Every structure is written in C-alpha cells, then in structure tokens.
Amino acid sequence: MKKQNNLRSLAAQAVELVVEQGQSLSNVLPPLQQKVADKDKALLQELCFGVLRTLSQLEWLINKLMSRPMTGKQRTVHYLIMVGFYQLLYTRVPPHAALAETVEGAVAIKRPQLKGLINGVLRQFQRQQETLLNEFATSDARFLHPGWLVKRLQNAYPTQWQHIIEANNQRPPMWLRVNRTHHTRDGWLGLLEDAGMKGYPHPDYPDAVRLETPAPVHALPGFAEGWVTVQDASAQGCAVFLAPQNGEHILDLCAAPGGKTTHILEVAPEADVLAVDIDEQRLSRVYDNLKRLGMKATVKQGDGRYPAQWCGEQQFDRILLDAPCSATGVIRRHPDIKWLRRDRDIAELAQLQAEILDAVWPRLKPGGTLVYATCSVLPEENRDQIKTFLQRTPDAALSETGTPDQPGQQNLPGGEEGDGFFYAKLIKK
C-alpha cells in the first residue's frame, strides 16, 4: 500500500501533541512514522525535532506576523505555519516546495479554507525575513529555552549558562558503547573503518566511541549480534564509577530502557543483576536489550521508594540509582523536554529523589557502593541533593567524586562531548 500522508501536517500534529497535551515526542513520533514512506521518515523526524528545538523563535515569528492566534479546532494550523517557517529557515527543502507542501497540509488536516492564510503568512515572512531575524536576535526568545529554565541556568552557572544553552540547541553527536565481551574498542573501530565509517574513542570512558557522522544502527558492524550499543558517553560513566565485579549482587534502579543494565553485565558478566523500573511499558525495552546482547538479569516492575515490594530484605554489593530527573542535561537529544517540564517540577523531582535515596540506602551492604546519577544539570537535583543526603546519613561517605562541600561530578553538555550528567559515588561505612 502506497503511503501518501502530508509530512508537514503530521509534523504539526506531533508538535501540537507535545506542546498542548504534554506528550513526549518519543511516544508521539513512532505511530506517525508508520504513516509515511521509508524515504520520508528522516524528514518527518527532522521537522518534529527541529520545530521543538526552535519553538521559541517560531512562536515569536507567528506573534509578529499574525494579529491573533489560531485557537480551538484551528490550532493545528498554528503549528503547521511553524513547520513552514522551520523549513524556510533551517532546511535544504527548496522554498517553493516548502511553501506548496505546507499549504497543502491544510487539506490533510481538513482546513482547506485556510490555505490562503498559510500561504500569505509564509510569503510575508519571506519578504520580511532579514528585518524579522535582526529583531529576533535581540529578543528574550533568542535563547530558544523557556524563561524559567534560562533563569535557573543563569543562577546555577553564572559564567557558563550561555555555553549550556548553546549546547542544548545543537544536534547531538552519536555515541556508541563497544561490547567488551565481543571485541576490544580498537578492534571494533577497525571493523567500523572496514565498513567505510570513522569513529573516535573517548579519553575517559573505555568502551565509548563517537561516530564522525551519525549512521542508522543496521549499518553498524555487529549491531544485531550485540557487538555495539547506542549510548551517550556520559551515560557510560555510570558503570565506570560503579565498577561492578563478577559474583556481586547489583541493583540497577530506574533501569529502563536497560542501557546501563547491559553495560554492567558487559563489565561483570558473572554479576547477579536486578533491574527495577516503575514503568511497565519501558521495561519491555530492558528485555529487548538483554535479548539482543544475549544477557540475563532479573527484571522487575517496582517503585524505588518501596524496595520491600520488589526485593524483600535482600541487600546489594552495589546499587546504581539513575534517579528520575528533569533531564535538563539531554535537551539537545530530546528538545521536547524544554516544553514538557515546568518550573514547579524541579522541587517535586528533588523530593522524589530524596525519598528513593533514603529508601534504598539500607539495602546497601556495609562497604558497598551506591552511584547516584541524573541526566540533569540543575544543582537542586544533584550537588544539593547529595549534600543534604550526606548530612542526614552518617554511614554514607563520598568517594572519588567531589568534596563534601561540592559533592559529585557534573558533566555539562557540549560539542562532541557527552550529554549533561551528574554522578556521586557513595560508600557505606
């Protein structure tokens, strides 16, 4: 069956679901991808990610060029116009094709009477583009982040906040993790070169490789056989700090989708690993990852605040707590985060993190290691969280990562490096 859906209208619907209904793009996009031909999937993804990355700018332009916002049943048209702006500003789609296809999108969303309006706004933008962009360059919207997040970053990083924002607005590099049970990193890099691709090793994380140019996973040597996994370099730091050993009982808490679970088992194939996550649906991806890599772990659904429900009285040699967080360190990878999070979420997340930490600490054996990690850059979830935990937990000591006054290691997103990530390694006295 030939797939004939209008890409621009699908992108507009996806962005509307994210911004208006708070759905994540990772949930919204896959069903829409099924509606388009394989050759068009990359463009649909580019339009969705791109519009969400630059949403502040596109919204600003609409407010300049339209006297009143589109509301109610016409709201999708608002996002369709954004898709048009994005193509004209950021893609290599020829302007005449961008205009024609975007205008035609009105028919696909059953608003053919608005074709003239869409065409008029996009043509007006083309005529005024230089003037508008000069004005935009001095507006608050130029940071492409919600105001509350800009303020938090300015407060937390007085000299680095612009670097963080610029990094968040870039396209992310593609990092891989070589499965050391199959190949050395250098050995796999040789296979990659034989396949006509180039990769670069990370200086600190022994399994990490950055592709010179992102590629589909099926093109990677041995991906289906489990020789390599897509995982950001910073996420690989979790297993480095955890340093799992064969024969140990290890808890991976908040484990989905299973990237860190499988990394633990690559480092320590004889470890006994329990992977727990609250989200039953996302646990299916843990099973998928274990299966592709040919590994075994115990996988359970459970709430980190109530360990008795999923592990009884069991104690562990090592615990990895990749805590639920604002994900403000991975915005370049998931631009919808900027529009899904709210300022009030941060205090709620910090409270949840503290509850999980307090609940699982008694499950760590004396002398054991707990690595607390987040993909956040906000101190409330990171340094402040660990500082207060150490103050109220006399048998916890910091190891390798920072000082009691400035606990943990904070990686900031940037360039070809890894995502924004925080780690604190704690030892039980």
From Swiss-Prot:
Cell compartments where the protein resides: Cytoplasm
PROSITE patterns listed in its UniProt record: NOL1_NOP2_SUN, SAM_MT_RSMB_NOP
Top EC group: transferase
Enzyme Commission designation: 2.1.1.176
Superkingdom field: Bacteria
Keywords from the UniProt entry: Cytoplasm, Methyltransferase, RNA-binding, rRNA processing, S-adenosyl-L-methionine, Transferase
Keyword Lipid metabolism tagged: no
Binding-site list for S-adenosyl-L-methionine: 254-260, 277, 303, 322
Catalytic activity as recorded in UniProt: cytidine(967) in 16S rRNA + S-adenosyl-L-methionine = 5-methylcytidine(967) in 16S rRNA + S-adenosyl-L-homocysteine + H(+)
Major localization class: cytoplasm
Annotated GO CC locations: cytosol
One Pfam family it belongs to: RsmF-B_ferredox
Biased composition (Polar residues): 400-412
Active site: 375 (nucleophile)
Single GO term (MF): RNA binding
Region of interest called Disordered, as start-end residue ranges on this chain: 397-419
Classification via CDD domains: AdoMet_MTases, Methyltransferase_Sun
One annotated GO biological process: regulation of DNA-templated transcription
InterPro entries in UniProt: MeTrfase_RsmB-F_NOP2_cat, MeTrfase_RsmB-F_NOP2_dom, NusB-like_sf, NusB_RsmB_TIM44, RCMT, rRNA_ssu_MeTfrase_B, rRNA_ssu_MeTfrase_B_ent, RsmB-like_ferredoxin
PANTHER family xrefs: NOL1_NOP2_SUN FAMILY PROTEIN _ ANTITERMINATION NUSB DOMAIN-CONTAINING PROTEIN, NOP2 YEAST -RELATED NOL1/NOP2/FMU SUN DOMAIN-CONTAINING
Protein purpose: Specifically methylates the cytosine at position 967 (m5C967) of 16S rRNA.
Family of this protein: Belongs to the class I-like SAM-binding methyltransferase superfamily. RsmB/NOP family.
Protein known as: Ribosomal RNA small subunit methyltransferase B
Originating organism: Salmonella enteritidis PT4 (strain P125109)
Gene name of the record: rsmB
